[in-house]
């Protein structure tokens, strides 16, 4: 697992993109197709405020659709795409066509062997093992 600071990162300046109970597409070939975010690691918010996550954040997901051996199970996952536009430090705005996650093992390696579709550069920098199996980094 990466260092604690790398896992949590900084949420300052990010707009709330994905929150608790958001549906996401699973972008790897681990057998899961769709999942729901049920927890966000490292969120330090206000009482009764719905926690949110952004690109490259670590979340807990529950698989809703997929192969029978992964359905109805909980996994850790990393957000690699989001539909909500976000601004990079150089001033460019980036948004993707869908909200997608990659399921990871407890040691931080991806559960699948390939990632379908592009992933954000922010996720690739924070999670280099995911970037190594990704087909495209934007």
UniProtKB/Swiss-Prot annotation:
RNA-binding is among the record's keywords: yes
Database matches in Pfam families: Ribosomal_L14
GO molecular function: large ribosomal subunit rRNA binding; structural constituent of ribosome
GO CC annotation: cytosolic large ribosomal subunit
Record bears the keyword RNA-binding: yes
Keywords: Ribonucleoprotein, Ribosomal protein, RNA-binding, rRNA-binding
BP GO terms, sorted: translation
Annotated PANTHER family: 50S/60S RIBOSOMAL PROTEIN L14/L23 (PTHR11761), LARGE RIBOSOMAL SUBUNIT PROTEIN UL14 (PTHR11761:SF8)
Role played: Binds to 23S rRNA. Forms part of two intersubunit bridges in the 70S ribosome.
Subunit structure, as described in the record: Part of the 50S ribosomal subunit. Forms a cluster with proteins L3 and L24e, part of which may contact the 16S rRNA in 2 intersubunit bridges.
Protein family membership: Belongs to the universal ribosomal protein uL14 family.
Protein name in the entry: Large ribosomal subunit protein uL14
